[in-house]
Amino acid sequence: MGKNVIWNDQAKAQLRAIDQPTALRILHALARYLETGEGDVKRLQNIEPPEFRLRIGDYRVRFHDHHGDSVRITAVKHRREAYR
């Protein structure tokens, strides 16, 4: 059974602003991570509650993993903007 994915409004807008082929690549990579756990994921330091980032080429998806049953996507940004 897969995880429930919750997108905040800002993350939805950021994904819509990205060109379609890149946005689809991001969605496929996110789906693969949610199904298999595969992907370049790291916990971000000094952030509470714990937040993670999934690296997909030049883009970063920031999210909270809620005890394994749901994931809240908080941002989808180009790497030059992701850590500001």
Report residues per predicted region.
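A short, surface-exposed loop/turn module that caps and links secondary-structure elements
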Residues: 29-54
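Enriched for short, Lys/Arg-rich terminal
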Residues: 1-6, 10-13, 17, 21-24, ...
